[in-house]
């Protein structure tokens, strides 16, 4: 198979048997067995060393790819995407129908990625779409209908448990009696028969989705063509949420004569996304959508229908404005539109035999529009006097336009003589990127019926705009040589000049080299080890770069604000300008040095294939948002400081287990180990802390710490040692006959007046008092290893595909439990049902803090959980109709299939899904707060070719 398999290596293709670098290829047959709108969703666990994550399970293009560990701390860790030869720093895979993709190749080591120089440090994803073939037109239809639902939701308290909790918080006196003892429910026990509202039942739905793709491919004379149209309608499992995409693609290849060939590729996609923003950076937890879903009380003491209530009047709305989540989903208008256009045109001319000149030009445009409208039936549009978040009827419009222009010119030469095989390529590239952003926000719109058209009908409009541009000029070359397909050498060099840096630092040079020895082709091995069908040793070393910073970060920035920066002059205020950032003309790209040692083995005529790679990837001159001396006038600046190292082992095993006339069974297994270590930070800086913006109580409390000598982004807080028990106290009786508990001497405390049931944190310093000095590492969001396991079974006309995915050794900071298993003294807020096992005088051995607990609003190991999981990700069962059945219908092939996704998960994580990270970054991995749930889905599909 390796004899004919071709792999994209950037500016060319190479037979897999001749590879000297580390390149992983996706099995497109496996990836398209389950219908998805974005192929990235199916990549996780398929290729060793490639980690695919999403913040949550919401519909849309929210996927992140990290190759061989995060190569930056505060910079981007995303790979470079090259789609049909057009390089882009942002993924365009959401605009391509998976059925249009021919291959996906992942360049991992420096030998492979150095050809992309300053943008190759995080790896390269090369996507090649399907091209036209010779022969008469062939029409193919792919369609499916999908049903999705939420299988695993957290259980919340019922009416009785909720009211019992309120009694503990309020006491049994007048406040509780006034709020919860009513004519309808005269006693606490009466709530056993009360109607309990689980708001999840009202905001989740069974989502019905469908997608359709039709393509035509063939040739007419010397013109080869393929064209396709697709429509995808994906409903979200939260009401009023979903994504629709309209997409079209055309690929043309015209052979003008024996020397000249012209290619054209064009793709257009329009994507529309609706639905609430479930999780995002915010200063108040009450603005998170799932907060209202889980916290809204489950019972009405008066028997009124809570579904008709706009807000919960039982809470202090100046601190916790809890809005009806059903009305939020129904009435908040959230409409995002993305229009993406990409086309490439290229001409290849053979100057003399084996010497070819290729000239390409490309253009990409991305227009994005975000519309938000909040009427009177929404959180911020409602004018309740206690609603401190009210802006009246309000609207927001954000629009961005991004353009990219590309010209690339390559000259390639190939020579094969006797046992010598030589290939050389030289090239130059020019790319220009422009962006224009503008937004307007207005409040107190006079007439709600105007909708988004009322932007000019409000008061206090806030208008923002920005414009940017960057350019990249590059020269590059590569030489491949092998002798007798046994001894290989590859050398690559790229020089990049970027406008993102000052003139003295604009050019960077990125060399790489690799060697390989195909020892199984040596006669002394081939003659004595016939069972060894392939054996190759690979070694590579090289440098790549990362230039993912702003267009003008090396410059000092001036800003102005009429309200903040002004001074009196001649009796009136004149706007003032201030520096918002520090100039740094020494700024340059991050440089990543990578060493890779690989071994490829094949046994029994290719029935068993094993690939292993060990790598050490060191990034220096990190583009770090570093703390600087206050005497500079700034608190931080973007500097080239620090060093980060990733090292690991990747193993891929592919086997043909059984192969007979009627039955075959193939397996593919991959596992990747990665160790991340910070070698250095800013001069004299032993660590850096990171904060999560999700609530005011925690915005000044570090949640993560990154220490020199350890991996980045470890969870930070107190070690939780359970709750204080009665035996920790001396008990006395006061003059009123009330029991008084005083901590015994020598038992450390965090809050004065600690009582039984309060959280107990470990005194690491031994000072006898718990304080910030006792905080330490309490978890690690980075997995020890990740992987996947695929099985393909074929029996006669039936095919079965089963795919497992896993992650092991990573922790999750479950912020949902920090709120919903920790009410402290907060009234009228529902909790997870797990909180019924809290500490109470009747349950004094519980390690869950009591109601009204003191000192509980802290990051601690109580809320850090093992996020390891083994997931049965996909199953697909298909039937291929026999040709004799289809021939009378003029159909050449047809397959009907049933598939399921996110079927079952083995995990110790208490949340709805361990595959979550709502604040995903190298410094804050594994944070779970108010996620959009990941749906279980079943699809019925049809593939037909005419």
Regions found by a protein language model. Give the residues of each.
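Extracellular/periplasmic, surface-exposed regions of secreted and cell-surface proteins
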Residues: 3, 31-36, 77-78, 210, ...
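Short aromatic-centered micro-motifs
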Residues: 81, 481, 742, 793
């Amino acid at each position: 198979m390796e004899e004919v398999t071709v792999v994209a290596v950037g500016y060319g293709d190479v037979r897999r048997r001749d590879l000297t670098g580390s390149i992983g290829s996706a099995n497109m047959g496996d990836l398209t067995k389950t219908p998805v709108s974005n192929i990235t969703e199916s990549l996780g666990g398929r290729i060793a060393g490639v980690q695919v994550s999403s913040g949550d399970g919401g519909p849309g293009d929210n996927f992140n790819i990290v190759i061989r560990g995060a190569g930056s701390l505060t910079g981007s860790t995303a790979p470079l995407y090259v789609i049909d030869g057009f390089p882009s720093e942002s993924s365009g895979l959401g605009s391509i129908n998976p059925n249009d993709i021919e291959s996906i190749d992942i360049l991992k080591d420096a030998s492979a990625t150095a050809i992309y120089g300053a943008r190759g440090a995080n790896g390269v994803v090369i996507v090649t779409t399907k091209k036209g073939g010779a022969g008469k037109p062939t029409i193919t239809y792919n369609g499916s209908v999908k049903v999705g639902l939420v299988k695993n939701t957290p259980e919340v308290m019922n009416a009785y448990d909720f009211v019992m909790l309120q009694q503990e918080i309020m006491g049994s006196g007048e406040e509780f009696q006034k709020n919860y003892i009513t004519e309808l429910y005269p006693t606490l026990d009466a709530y056993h028969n009360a109607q309990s509202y689980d708001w999840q039942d009202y905001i989740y739905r069974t989502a019905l989705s469908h997608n359709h793709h039709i393509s035509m491919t063939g040739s007419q004379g010397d013109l080869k063509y393929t064209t396709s149209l697709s429509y995808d309608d994906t409903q979200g499992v939260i009401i009023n949420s979903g994504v629709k995409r309209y997409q079209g693609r055309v690929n043309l290849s015209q052979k003008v004569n024996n020397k000249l060939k012209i290619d054209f590729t064009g793709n257009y996609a329009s994507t529309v996304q609706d639905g609430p923003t479930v999780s995002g950076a915010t200063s108040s937890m009450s603005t998170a959508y799932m907060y209202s879903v889980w916290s809204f009380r489950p019972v009405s003491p008066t028997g009124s229908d809570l579904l008709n209530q706009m807000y919960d009047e039982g809470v202090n709305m100046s601190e916790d404005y809890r809005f009806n989540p059903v009305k939020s989903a129904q009435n908040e208008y959230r409409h995002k539109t993305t229009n993406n256009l990409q086309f490439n045109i290229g001409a290849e001319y053979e100057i003399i035999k084996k010497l070819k000149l290729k000239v390409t030009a490309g253009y990409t445009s991305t227009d994005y529009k975000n519309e938000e409208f909040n009427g009177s039936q929404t959180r911020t549009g409602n004018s309740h006097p206690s609603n401190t978040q009210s802006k009246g009827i309000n609207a927001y419009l954000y629009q961005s336009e991004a353009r990219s222009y590309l010209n690339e010119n390559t000259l390639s030469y190939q020579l094969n003589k006797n046992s010598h095989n030589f290939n050389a390529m030289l090239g130059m590239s020019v790319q220009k990127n422009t962006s224009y952003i503008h937004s307007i926000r207005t409040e107190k719109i006079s007439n709600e019926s105007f909708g988004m058209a009322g932007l000019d009908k409000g008061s206090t409009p806030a208008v923002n705009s920005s414009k940017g541009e960057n350019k990249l000029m590059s020269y590059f070359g590569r030489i491949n040589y092998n002798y007798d397909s046994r001894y290989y050498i590859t050398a690559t060099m790229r020089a990049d000049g970027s406008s993102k840096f000052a003139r003295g630092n604009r050019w960077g040079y990125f060399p790489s080299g690799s060697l390989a020895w195909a020892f199984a082709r040596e006669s002394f091995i081939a003659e004595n080890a016939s069972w060894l069908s392939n054996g190759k040793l690979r070694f590579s070393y090289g440098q790549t770069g990362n230039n993912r910073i702003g267009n003008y970060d090396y410059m000092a920035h001036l800003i102005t604000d009429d309200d903040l920066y002004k001074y009196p002059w001649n009796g009136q205020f004149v706007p003032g300008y201030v520096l918002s950032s520090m100039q740094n003309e020494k700024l340059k790209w991050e440089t990543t040095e990578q060493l890779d040692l690989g071994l490829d083995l094949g046994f029994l005529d290719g029935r068993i294939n094993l690939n292993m790679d060990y790598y050490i990837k060191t990034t220096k001159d990190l583009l770090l948002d570093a703390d600087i001396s206050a005497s500079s006038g700034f608190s931080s600046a973007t500097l080239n400081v620090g060093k980060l190292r990733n090292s690991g082992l990747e193993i891929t095993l592919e086997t043909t287990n059984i192969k007979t006339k009627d039955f075959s069974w193939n397996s593919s297994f991959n596992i990747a180990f990665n160790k991340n270590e910070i070698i250095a930070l800013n001069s004299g800086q032993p660590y850096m802390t990171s904060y999560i913006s999700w609530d005011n109580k925690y915005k000044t409390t570090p949640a993560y710490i990154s220490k020199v000598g350890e991996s980045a982004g470890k969870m930070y807080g107190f070690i939780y040692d359970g709750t204080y028990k009665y035996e920790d106290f001396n008990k006395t009786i006061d003059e009123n006959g009330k029991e008084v508990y005083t901590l015994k001497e020598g038992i450390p405390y965090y809050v004065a007046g600690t009582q039984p049931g309060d959280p107990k944190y470990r005194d690491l310093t031994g000072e006898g008092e718990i304080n910030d000095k006792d905080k330490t590492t309490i978890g690690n969001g980075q997995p020890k290893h990740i992987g996947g396991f695929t099985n393909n079974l074929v029996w006669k006309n039936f095919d079965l595909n089963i795919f497992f995915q896993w992650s092991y050794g990573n922790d999750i900071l479950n912020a949902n439990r920090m709120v919903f298993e920790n009410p402290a003294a907060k009234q009228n807020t529902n909790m997870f049902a797990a909180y019924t096992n809290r500490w109470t005088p009747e349950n004094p051995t519980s390690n869950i803090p009591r109601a009204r607990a003191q000192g509980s609003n802290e990051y601690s190991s109580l809320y850090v959980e093992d996020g390891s999981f083994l997931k049965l990700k996909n199953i697909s069962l298909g039937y291929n109709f026999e040709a004799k059945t289809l021939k009378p219908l003029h159909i050449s092939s047809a397959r009907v299939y049933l598939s399921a996704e996110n079927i079952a998960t083995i995990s110790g994580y208490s949340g709805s899904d361990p595959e979550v990270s709502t604040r995903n970054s190298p410094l804050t991995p594994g944070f779970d707060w108010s996620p959009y749930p990941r749906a279980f889905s079943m699809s019925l599909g049809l593939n037909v070719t005419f």
